[in-house]
Amino acid sequence: FKAVVRENIAGRFAEWNTELETFVGTTSEVLIYCYQVWWERIGATKASGITKLMFSEAQNFPAIAQFYQQEVILPGRALIRRMLQRGMERGEFREMDLDYGTYIVLAPMMFLMLWNNSMGPCSLPDEVFTPEQYIRTQIDNILHGLCVRPAAGATPPPSQNP
């Protein structure tokens, strides 16, 4: 189990940190890129089932839960926190509680992993749920909450639909 987690998720944090450090563009563009890359590299793969497994079994295996926390949860939250901090420092994102801001970014990813590995297969045949469209909708929603708001009376910037 540990080897699978390290190979498929935890082992990618060095790569993701480098991508964040070298990214040229706005923090909104970084966020869009991160969601898209996460979906391609984790969410759309069998590795997404690891998170569902941890959701359902972590309380039964404290040592595995601690391992997952150290190898995946803490580095993931730190990476998201750095991205949000970058946006705040550049004046692109409004000031926020970064501890809770990370959960705002994580929640759509967690939902997709749970959906694909549990409720998705139970969907009605005519129900269309496209993960990519869900991600685009969530990005738009999150960015409208994170971005600096124009001063009263100012014209708002155009929507950035990815």
Provide a role label for each language-model segment:
Residues 29, 40-49, 53-55, 63-89, ...:
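Amphipathic alpha-helical packing segments from all-alpha helical-bundle domains
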Residues 9, 15-51, 99-105, 135:
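Hydrophobic alpha-helical connector segments
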Residues 15-20, 52-56, 69, 119-125:
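Short linear capping/connector segments at secondary-structure termini
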